[in-house]
Regions:
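Sec-dependent signal peptide recognition
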Residues: 2-9
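C-terminal motif of bacterial Sec signal peptides marking the signal peptidase cleavage site
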Residues: 14-17
Length: 216
């Protein structure tokens, strides 16, 4: 019987190895893999309930896709905090496993990209990209400059106002302007232009979406 012991041991090792391979085929665990998304939910106005309300939206959407164990923050600047200082240090992957940026410097040096700036389920945001559905919704609320700092006067009173006399700075998730233009600030994912007003996020190509980042 002793001569069979090594064979039995080898079989046990092989069985464990096969079990590990099977586990690896189940795909990434979203509780740690997902680190960035454009919110699938929208807002008709710039009143998001302040930073707390926006963060809560990010946390809820992340939880719905199995990533709620991470701490999520909205990429929004206010009079008291810059968006870049709220989102951790990276790296950040999207729902499809692609790296959006490895760190803050890389993040703020890049432009929008329809294939990377997707929602929490990996779906592209309607924009100016070829074949996009209508309506255009690539204007994402940020209230920020291109380097992630507050754009004074363009934060809808720190995301608590739906006033027609105020506006918000937005970025283009796809990095494109009309007719797929990439001139001027149009490619900016976080600071392309100001929207029409805080009373209505739809004109000019918006729907009140926000960017969400995992800070841990």
């Amino acid at each position: 019987m002793k001569m069979y012991i090594p064979l039995l041991a080898l079989a046990a090792v092989m069985a464990v190895g096969c079990g590990d391979d099977d586990d690896g085929m189940t795909g990434p665990d979203n509780s740690t893999a997902l680190g960035f998304f454009v919110s699938s939910s929208t807002s008709a106005t710039g009143n998001l309930g302040g930073l707390a309300g926006a963060d809560g939206r990010c946390q809820g959407l992340a939880a719905a896709v199995g990533a709620g164990s991470r701490t999520w923050r909205a990429y929004l600047s206010t009079s008291s905090v810059n968006a870049r200082d709220r989102i951790g240090s990276g790296p950040w992957r999207n729902a499809n496993g692609a790296v959006v940026a490895n760190n803050l410097t890389e993040l703020h040096a890049r432009t929008g990209d329809a294939a990377l700036f997707v929602d929490e389920r990996g779906t592209r945001i309607n924009g100016q990209w070829s074949g996009s559905p209508s309506p255009v919704q690539h204007d994402v609320l940020t209230g920020s400059t291109a380097d992630g700092r507050v754009m004074a006067g363009l934060t809808c009173s720190d995301w608590t106002s739906a006033s027609a006399s105020e506006a918000a700075q937005v970025g283009h998730s796809d990095g494109l302007g009309p007719n797929m233009s990439t001139t001027g600030s149009l490619p900016s994912w976080n600071s392309a232009h100001a929207n029409e007003s805080c009373a209505n996020t739809a004109p000019r190509g918006g729907s009140g979406r926000i960017y969400c980042f995992a800070v841990n």
